[in-house]
Amino acid sequence: MDDNPTAVKLDQGGNQAPQGQGRRRLPKALGYITGDMKEFANWLKDKPQALQFVDWVLRGISQVVFVSNPISGILILVGLLVQNPWCALNGCVGTVVSTLTALLLNQDRSAITAGLQGYNATLVGILMAIYSDKGNYFWWLLFPVSAMSMTCPIFSSALNSVLSKWDLPVFTLPFNMALSMYLSATGHFNPFFPSTLVTPVTSVPNVTWPDLSALQLLKSLPVGVGQIYGCDNPWAGGIFLGAILLSSPLMCLHAAIGSLLGIIAGLSLSAPFENIYAGLWGFNSSLACIAIGGMFMALTWQTHLLALACALFTAYLGASMSHVMAVVGLPSCTWPFCLATLLFLLLTTKNPNIYKMPISKVTYPEENRIFYLQSTKRTVQGPL
């Protein structure tokens, strides 16, 4: 006689077992497409090289927002196409060229397969297209895009040699260096590749508070995330948030919070409303909030609050740097995010709940937190 009530219930209700199995299969199926899709990467190892290369490129496109997920890469590519197909094309060209260059330079294969040798060039391609004064479909631009994309693995390798001594990531420093170098070399008056003229503020902006639109502020939240890829379309920003959500809900939450804090910082400094609506106050703080809020620091309440502080600090630093760099005719790009986040990662504290992740163990926030909890448990049990 079987006294197991579960077994009796399943025998009497024949449809119970399939439903239970279905509920179990759904989280398992989601596990294959969320996170960093490690199982898919393992499955690709014995597949044709061309198929693997496509995976590396898609991961490179998504790595701009710290995501190593090819499906997220596809969604982000869709968002770029919604914004501007020409920018999407330049971003893809940059990613492909940079990844190929990394292969030719025999860079670390695990970094290449994770998309870490492509994401800087994704931004280089997109932003070179945006800052080009020749407009869309100026096909000659693909040559300097390819040339500058080839410098990204060189910058990455050189910076990694220095920053690895402190176990720090290179972030988008290679992108900032490559784009700043290109825009400085060409400028607005170059006869072949003129760029958009960047000028400092020379008069008091006309800010009329009664004209502030709540709807526009609401739209500026996804636009702030979209501006990470140089997109001012709220639909594109919404797609990017969905791509981040697919990989990590915690990252998506911090991306949105970071953009919101950027808006608040802009309002606190009485910034021109059009700049806030365009998301120019949100993208650096969004990246900073993701980086500290679970990506490069294990997520706890303490690091969550630290991420909020870093996002605000980044937004104010962005305002400062944009004024300074405009004097020499350059945009601030993601310099504020890189400098502010590196500063926060160099923070030393005796608080055990503020735990900086070893770079070799960084994956995505949920997995990082599991590693942190296991590491803490081993530390507690060690003396025993």
Curated annotation (Swiss-Prot):
Region (Disordered): 1-23
One GO cellular component, as annotated: plasma membrane
Keywords of this entry: Cell membrane, Glycoprotein, Membrane, Transmembrane, Transmembrane helix, Transport
Chemical reaction(s) catalysed: urea(in) = urea(out)
Feature type site, description Important for channel permeability: 334
TM segment ranges: 61-81, 85-105, 111-131, 138-158, 169-189, 237-257, 279-299, 327-347
Membrane topology: Multi-pass membrane protein
Pfam families: UT
GO MF, one annotated term: urea transmembrane transporter activity
UniProt entry tagged with the keyword Membrane: yes
Gene Ontology BP, a term: urea transmembrane transport
UniProt-listed InterPro entries: Ammonium/urea_transptr, Urea_transporter
Protein's UniProt keywords contain Glycoprotein: yes
Annotated glycosylation sites: 206
Locations listed in the record: Cell membrane; Basolateral cell membrane
Self-association state and partner proteins as the record states: Homotrimer; each subunit contains a pore through which urea permeates. Identified in a complex with STOM.
Job description of the protein: Mediates the transport of urea driven by a concentration gradient across the cell membranes of erythrocytes and the renal inner medullary collecting duct which is critical to the urinary concentrating mechanism. Facilitates water transport in erythrocytes.
Family from the record: Belongs to the urea transporter family.
Protein name as annotated: Urea transporter 1
Gene that this sequence comes from: SLC14A1
